[in-house]
């Protein structure tokens, strides 16, 4: 399998985003989004997905964080799709349950080529620090649309909003890792009866 590395830049009048991902990395992350709590969540994806991930973002945070968070999701999705290439030889499906104290979340992903998000999370409060938790849904929608994956995210329980978010992002990383992992029994084969994804 060739190197699974991609770098994508996205520049609009609202944001400038750069993402670099190595799917066969060591879990190293570098983040500068202007949103410290989002940086913390993205670091969970790198570490638990065991991917090397660099994200630099400049956005219109003087308005709010919506454009920046959504566009990071979009650009990460584009980078993921590019790094995966034709998806031959991967496992395709991934899932993870992750607990953190009282919180428990489940994430299931399918590198199907069909964008779809089922996001079922009721945060116990609207903000974590100064971060608007509604924006996590925008992040995942942007990712799904541009990675062309089906993604199910369910928070099963949790009273602490920080714990809820962290379990989601850790499970997201672990599910991505499982789905993108090379399957030695599928070398050179697309994991679909259609012959393409």
Swiss-Prot record:
One of its GO terms (biological process) is L-histidine biosynthetic process. Belongs to the imidazoleglycerol-phosphate dehydratase family. PROSITE patterns: IGP_DEHYDRATASE_1 (PS00954), IGP_DEHYDRATASE_2 (PS00955). The lineage of its organism: Bacteria, Pseudomonadati, Pseudomonadota, Gammaproteobacteria, Chromatiales. InterPro entries: IGPD_sf (IPR038494), ImidazoleglycerolP_deHydtase (IPR000807), ImidazoleglycerP_deHydtase_CS (IPR020565), Ribosomal_Su5_D2-typ_SF (IPR020568). The gene is hisB. It comes from Thioalkalivibrio sulfidiphilus (strain HL-EbGR7). Gene3D superfamilies: Imidazole glycerol phosphate dehydratase, domain 1. Its main location: cytoplasm. Pathway: Amino-acid biosynthesis; L-histidine biosynthesis; L-histidine from 5-phospho-alpha-D-ribose 1-diphosphate: step 6/9. Its EC number is 4.2.1.19. HAMAP family: HisB (MF_00076). This is Imidazoleglycerol-phosphate dehydratase.
